[in-house]
UniProtKB/Swiss-Prot annotation:
This is Autoinducer 2 import system permease protein LsrD. One of its GO terms (cellular component) is plasma membrane. The complex is composed of two ATP-binding proteins (LsrA), two transmembrane proteins (LsrC and LsrD) and a solute-binding protein (LsrB). It comes from Klebsiella pneumoniae subsp. pneumoniae (strain ATCC 700721 / MGH 78578). Part of the ABC transporter complex LsrABCD involved in autoinducer 2 (AI-2) import. Probably responsible for the translocation of the substrate across the membrane. It comes from the Bacteria. The gene is lsrD.
Amino acid sequence: MKLKLNWESALLALLIAEILLFGALNPRMLDINMLLFSTSDFICIGIVALPLTLVIISGGIDISLGSTIGLCAIALGVMTQAGWPLWLAVSLTLLLGLLCGLFNAALIHYTGINPLVITLGTLYLYGGGALLLSGMAGATGYEGIGGFPDSFTAFANLTLGGLPLPLVLFAIITFFFWLLAHRGRFGRHLFLLGQNPRAARYAALSVNGIPYVLYGLVGVASAVAALVMVSYFGSARSDLGRDLLMPALTAAVLGGANIYGGSGSILGTALAALLVGYLQQGLQMVGIPNQVSSALSGALLVVVVMGRSLSLHREWVRATWRRLFSHKTIGA
């Protein structure tokens, strides 16, 4: 717990240092209103990174979430375009996200194939479905489907207590997942499953049932992200979630999730999501192209994974270092 608290404190310090650094380059970065309301640009990274953290803790992975967002977004647009009531379209969008997640879990359960391979396949399946729906609706390219009610598009711009509503929603979701992962029996079962699946089976845990809950949560969170993004941009497009996978995965791993399973922190992921989001925002404000920002996110993920791997095998690293150093000393 102390180590986890220290890591989360380090992430908070890094977040503050990042804001101050970009603020020195562009003073607008230090404006409190800009800091608060710019979160609407990237808060969906955190919304999907939180359940993704749970999946990683369990020893799984889901790389189809970006396509799930696109499919849910365009499905919402098609239903709204057809004149369906908004409450029904939103409800069915959430249901679609849940079904996508459950379908991933079912494929993993019944085939026994690695989750990375399964979700890679469904990434293309859901992405293709989104493009098909988009084409059928006549929403090609970057046009998307518009015409949403003002009550829906206003959501992303509303405030509650002076805070943007999407940021408040993210805080509520963070608290929910924190309770789920760190303050209950389900969380203990989750960590045991990731650390030792065989022991989890011997303990009579629902080893096959837990992934359905986890991947279902990723699906629902992807649908929520789709709703927030459509409200924010005012149009539904099949490519809305295309660029969210890498930042979300980076946030989960940077936040403390072990890519091999068995450890992770919801609060760490939430802080890391803000860290990654403000990194992208700050780079844009100082004139760095989006391509460079994406490359830096990828590089950050590689560095974090390498660091985690070295920490897990630190004894081997130390032994190798001593062996190499002793050889050099003898040769001298």
